[in-house]
């Protein structure tokens, strides 16, 4: 009996189970699975991802999660669109040399800059 249960939690009840599944994620190098693998690898090489001061840059925004971390001379800035819609982002002013440490989309700005984030886009920039 599945009364009151969100039936899509059970694959046999999901309309898209043949295309959205673990096998499809493993076959797609741009899937969430591989993005998380890259993030785990990055965490092992960038201490600022784990340690340091955390500053929430947009604490009240309903769709964007933006923060900055600083640790031992490194600065990390992360912006993530948590919605299905494009979202405008205006960063705090930044100086110096930045590089994209990780992104789940191709063709992203090489430094934090005003941009229109695509659905579920996330970018990690680092300044050393």
Regions found by a protein language model. Name each.
Residues 1-8:
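Single conserved hydrophobic/aromatic residue that forms the stacking wall/gate
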Residues 10, 111-128:
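C-terminal beta-strand-rich structural cap/linker in extracellular carbohydrate-active enzymes
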Residues 13-76:
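Glycan-recognition and catalytic regions of carbohydrate-active enzymes
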Residues 39, 79-81, 120:
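Hydrophobic, well-ordered secondary-structure elements that form the walls
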Residues 61-63, 83, 109-111:
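Residues that act as N-cap/strand-start positions at coil-to-secondary-structure junctions
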Residues 81-82, 127:
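Residues immediately flanking
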Residues 82-95:
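Surface-exposed beta-strand/loop patches in extracellular or lumenal glycoproteins
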Residues 93-105:
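Solvent-exposed beta-hairpin/edge-strand motifs
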């Amino acid at each position: 009996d599945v009364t009151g249960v969100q039936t899509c939690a059970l694959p046999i009840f999901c309309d898209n189970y043949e295309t959205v599944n673990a096998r499809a994620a493993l076959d797609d190098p741009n899937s969430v699975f591989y993005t998380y693998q890259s993030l785990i690898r990055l965490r092992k090489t960038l201490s600022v991802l784990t340690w340091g001061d955390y500053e929430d840059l947009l604490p009240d925004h309903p769709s964007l999660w933006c923060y900055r971390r600083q640790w031992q001379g490194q600065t990390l800035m992360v912006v993530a669109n948590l919605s299905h819609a494009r979202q405008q982002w205006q960063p705090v002013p930044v100086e110096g040399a930045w590089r994209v440490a990780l992104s789940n989309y191709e063709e992203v700005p090489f430094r934090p800059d005003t941009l229109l984030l695509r659905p579920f886009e996330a970018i990690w920039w680092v300044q050393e």
